Amino acid sequence: MDSETDTDTHSICNSVSSGENYKSPESSDCEGYATPLASSLTDISNVINHSVTIKVPDTIADANDLEPGERTPVSTPRAISPPIVKQVMYLQKPRILVMTQREIHEECCSSEEEFYDVDDVQIRDVAQQLLNGVSDDKTETEAGNNDVIIAEEDRADTPIVIEDTREFEETYSEEDERQTPIQMENATSEVSSSEDEISDSVVELTNDMMSKITEIEEIHAQVHSESFGSSDSGDHLEVKSEATNFPEYSNTEEFEVPKNDYVTVENVNESTIDSVVIDSQTPTKDTKNEVNISQNVVNLVRLESHLENYDDETTNTVIAECVYDAQENEKCEKNEEDDLSPVLDSNKIKNSPESKFCEFRAESECYEQTEETDQIKQFVPLMEVSVANQEFDELCDIERNGGNSKDRPKDLNENVKAFDAEHHENSVLEYEQLPDVFSEITIAKTPIPVVHENSISGVSKESQVSFNQEAVQNELMPTHIISDEVETSSTTADNNIPFSDCSTHKVKVDFDGYSSGKEESLSSSTSSESFEFAEPVTENHIQDERAQALRNSIIERYPSNDTDDDELDSVGDEFDEDLLAVKQISAEVEQLVAAINAFGRDEEQQMSAYMVGKKMAAEKKRKSAMDTTAMTSSCQDQTVQTDNNSFILVDRHVPEVMESLQVEIDRLQGDLEKVKSGEKELLQINSKLKEELEESQQTIDGIEIEAEQQYTELTSEIDELCEIVQRKDQELAILKEKVTNVINIENSLKDDVDSQKVIVQRQKEIIENLREELDAITKKLGEVTKLRDKAVEEATLYKMKNMERDRFLSREAQMSMEIEDLQRELNKQKLILNQTSMAKLADTFDRKVLHLENELRERDMLICKQNQIINSHRKSPTGSVITHRKMQPRASVLAAAGNLPSAGSSSESFQNGLDVEAREALLSFILSDRHNQLANIYNIGRILDLTPQEERSVERHLTKDRFT
């Protein structure tokens, strides 16, 4: 769970001190006393060999707007603090176990009604009783205040009343008729754990209890030898001037019952006053009052204080349960009744004007403190908290209402301080020196006590019934206190044997006043459902953001060690209905799956397990209902009876709690209806499976009949096949004869094949000879082809030579003709030279030389190109014609330009090569000066189809002539 409580019980003879260690609901870092706070303080106290006190200054409480119920310091050695009474009531969740279908079918009606309807009626009755008991708070409080004043005045003279055993037995019988007794689980019938596990747990519990028995017997012997010498000694009421958060010294008022002692505590809790817990310690007079550890004795007394200055304020009451394992046999009890002296007075009850609402006011009597009780008190850890001392003294004076008792709290305070100085060296720690972790402890904030009584006799009887009910529960369920773990087991006839052959039920004590049981479950069950009844947490639980920040820091510093299952089952401060719904659905699905899977393995065994689990679940639901009734019915007296280890106070918010309880009951009823429907579905599935089984049996019978028919048919077929085999054997003999004939034929054919092989060998020899001759012929043919190729090459070379020779002759003729032309021009130039100067002649000569050189270069180029063309024609005769045709325009252009010999002398070739425009342009180019020639050189090059290289050479030539 998110918040846990731990009860520590110190039993010293007849004096009992009980404390509760609480922590914040948000923190769930550990269980029991294994908290960082408790462990750290315990280490400090062990080092200094005495207790440690934490003093919280008032300035810190005022600065943080602290209110009662918000913070409390913690003392060592066990970090005990008063209980946190929150406005939330937690009830333990019943476990719904998975059972088999056959048991449901056998007990479908009676068991289902018993399983589903037992607790609902009881819960409704308890809810109605609680609603009737808290109807009028203010009227009862005012009437009760006056009753307390009168009771305090008469407290010193009250006689001592001791109940008789017969009255106790009568009350027990009446209570047994009114309420169903709590039934515990039997190890032989209901506990699903194995015998080995039970034996191991019994051995462990026996060892733990024996160790505690030895310790308590030693303390008991010391106390009897030192403390109980005088028969007239009483108890002093020890009240500390500073409000204590641990029950130290208390006023004693007891209802003497053979098996029960009742202790009252008082808490006056206002905005500046912390809880004052007064515990009683009543030593017995007789040394024969031995303690039996196997039985449970509960001291429960209630004392209310009257506040004159706070008529309209809430009077807070903390009910502290002091539990210890001490009870004697019946013979010891009878002897004790004869020896015990009167100690307490019976309750004075005043009737209210209304018959329905009465206030029960307990009276407390103060006795002088003897030296023997001082020796007992040194076993009780001391704790001091810095609070308003004067206000507490004033409240104590108002409570006593007497001049003789006005100075008593101061005297008591002085006695307590003297006792502290004498027996303890109490170390005081300032709150500022503590780490931030210590700021998370909270003080119990208790509600207004409201008690409903119809008459004086009714109240007295009802109180006795409640007390006797606790005794009945103690007889039925002896509680073995082992640190923070309580084990309750059903009693046997021998009460002197605490560890008999009975099933134990382990209960973990939580930090919020309720117990989370470790439920046993069947091995066949897969999951269990649980529920909680919780009142919505209001905003008053967290007063400021700083407190929340401190809680978060503690949670981060000390993370949770709980399992995922505990986290899923926790409710915390906010109730998450969605999470519970998901858990319920998943649990139901798992139950159905487990029940369906059970039919596949061992149906009868699973069916019996189903019914056993169902009975166990019904018993657990009855027990949870009885626990709820025990807790809520005692709320009429403001006395809550739980497992003797937790606190649940009912205040003015009980109607709201009961409304939430009714809502949870309705939701539980819906869940039970769902389970009922699931069981019906499982029954339907079972019937379907039976029908399928019958159908399968019928199919098997049909298959067997068909198999017999097939067998007869197969036998007839086998006979037919045997006849066929005989015929086949005859045919096989005939075939064998044929095979022998074929073998003979094959032998003759083999002889023929051998003769043919000889013939083929001869033919192969002939073929080899022919192949050699053919190879010689092919060689000769290759040589002939080579000679032919050579001849062709020589012929081509001869042709080429002839062509070159012809071409050379043609060129020579052309050159001769050109030379003649040149000679003519030379003669003309001579004539011109004779008429011109030498410079012009030199110039013209140079130009002619250059012109001739250019023509020679062009001719050489043409010759090379023609040679290339000729070579290409030799290789491809068809390409020569095309190349020749391509070269004709080029030759005509060159002839027109005067490059060719034929174009320079004959006017016919010139006229045929160029058109009129080209002739005019070329003529103007020749006749123009150098500047115009350079300007028109590109036009002439385009007309003459000159290459860029030729155009550059012409341009270079013209520029050279110009500058020279």
Curated annotation (Swiss-Prot):
Coiled-coil residues: 656-840
Region annotation (Disordered) ranges: 1-31, 169-199
Organism: Caenorhabditis elegans
Keyword Coiled coil carried by entry: yes
Record field: compositional bias (Polar residues): 10-27
Protein's name according to its UniProt entry: Uncharacterized protein F36G3.1
Keywords assigned by UniProt, alphabetized: Coiled coil
